[in-house]
């Protein structure tokens, strides 16, 4: 392109809302390229959207279509958090399952810098909550985590935004625990 472009990558998670939520803001310089390595999982009726302020953008998307499993399935959640200074458990592992989270990203859409955000994990069996990270996120900025979090039944990942709205996206594998024989 002959000019810089401002772009948003968004996910519409139809199990939660019919509105698309930005999960990444990107500026691409004139004539430049960008590559996003974001593991996005779309479930039935979900949509991936790209918004740009410059026409005639070329986008390449690589994907894999997975069958829905009986005992395990890949899931994704995209949610808008609209209450500042209040913890939101955006993923809670259901009873009889284990969840392996491989990616979490928070996108600040508040219009200003959110300076005191907190990302935590709650271990329900120990009744304890531990801080994973805390700090500031600029407007249209992101805080992303490409690391594994394992949640057992009742455990949760939580985010407390300093400003609102914040969009959260997470991809994970949900494994249904098999019944134990002989009990």
Question: What residue spans do the PLM features occupy?
Answer:
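Tandem-repeat/low-complexity and Cys-motif detector
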Residues: 1, 27-28, 51-52, 94
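Coil residues (strongly favoring Ser/Thr
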Residues: 5, 86-89, 124, 156
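Beta-strand-rich interaction surfaces with strong enrichment in secreted/lumenal proteins
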Residues: 22-26, 37-39, 79, 132-135, ...
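A short, sequence-level motif marking secondary-structure junctions
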Residues: 27-30, 64-67, 135-139, 174-176
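C-terminal interaction-tip segments
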Residues: 43-44, 52-99, 103, 107-109, ...
């Amino acid at each position: 392109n002959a000019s810089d472009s401002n772009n948003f990558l968004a996910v519409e998670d139809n199990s939660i809302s019919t509105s698309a939520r930005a999960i990444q803001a990107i500026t691409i310089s004139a004539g430049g390229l960008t590559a996003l390595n974001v593991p996005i999982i779309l479930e039935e009726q979900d949509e991936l959207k790209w918004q740009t302020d410059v026409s005639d953008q070329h986008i390449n998307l690589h994907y894999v279509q997975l069958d829905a499993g009986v005992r395990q399935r890949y899931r994704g959640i995209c949610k808008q958090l609209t209450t500042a200074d209040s913890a939101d458990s955006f993923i809670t592992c259901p009873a009889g399952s284990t969840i392996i989270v491989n990616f979490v990203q928070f996108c600040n859409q508040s219009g200003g810098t959110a300076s005191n955000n907190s990302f935590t994990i709650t271990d329900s069996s120990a009744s304890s909550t531990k801080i994973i990270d805390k700090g500031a996120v600029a407007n249209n900025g992101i805080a992303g985590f490409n690391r594994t979090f394992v949640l057992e039944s009742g455990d949760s990942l939580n985010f407390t935004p300093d400003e609102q709205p914040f969009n959260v996206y997470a991809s994970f594998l949900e494994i249904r625990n098999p019944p134990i024989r002989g009990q």
